[in-house]
């Protein structure tokens, strides 16, 4: 069960937040939403978030070469852009979705070392997550891939970013 609430009732942080999320939010019935900060950008650069300021980071990293997200996003983006570019010019100014910082293994864009590029961007993303986490904070992520190589890339990049593995819960 969900409830749509007006942003005014949700205590939006400021007018710019209201413009970004529209005038309603979908929340579980009975829960009072807290203040939120919405930002769009790369996980490799979270400069808008202070160091050691977050308790928990929850994410779902890209799946190596399995899914090229920005190319799939272009299908929807070009249509959404027609409607939203005047209201959100900072997000819909480009003709297509940005692809230069997409953390995927894509031989068409990185012909020499696509897997190394993927791992390098994952490491940069994890380093930013590590920087913003409070001491004792936790990173939780889900990763679903049937091949070993992407798992190795994810784990190596986690360790290179300063994390250690505490628990895994494999899905069978």
Say what each PLM segment does.
Residues 48-72, 129-132, 141-144, 158:
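Conserved proline-anchored active-site loop of SAM-dependent methyltransferases
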Residues 138:
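Short glycine-centered segments of the SAM/dcSAM-binding site in methyltransferase folds
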């Amino acid at each position: 069960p969900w409830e749509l609430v007006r942003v005014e009732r949700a205590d939006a942080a400021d007018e710019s937040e209201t413009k970004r999320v529209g005038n309603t939010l979908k929340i579980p019935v009975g829960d009072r939403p807290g203040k939120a900060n919405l930002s769009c950008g790369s996980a490799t650069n979270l400069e808008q978030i202070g160091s050691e300021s977050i308790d928990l980071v929850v994410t779902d990293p890209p799946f190596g070469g399995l899914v090229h997200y920005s190319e799939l996003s272009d299908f929807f983006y070009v249509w959404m852009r027609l409607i939203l570019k005047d209201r959100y010019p900072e997000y819909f100014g480009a003709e297509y979705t940005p692809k230069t910082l997409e953390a995927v293994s894509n031989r068409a864009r990185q012909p020499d070392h696509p897997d190394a590029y993927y791992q390098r961007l994952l490491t940069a993303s994890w380093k930013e997550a590590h920087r913003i986490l409070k001491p004792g904070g936790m990173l939780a992520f889900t990763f679903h891939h049937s091949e070993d190589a992407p798992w190795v890339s994810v784990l190596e990049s986690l360790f290179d970013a300063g994390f250690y593995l505490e628990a895994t819960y494999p899905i069978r």
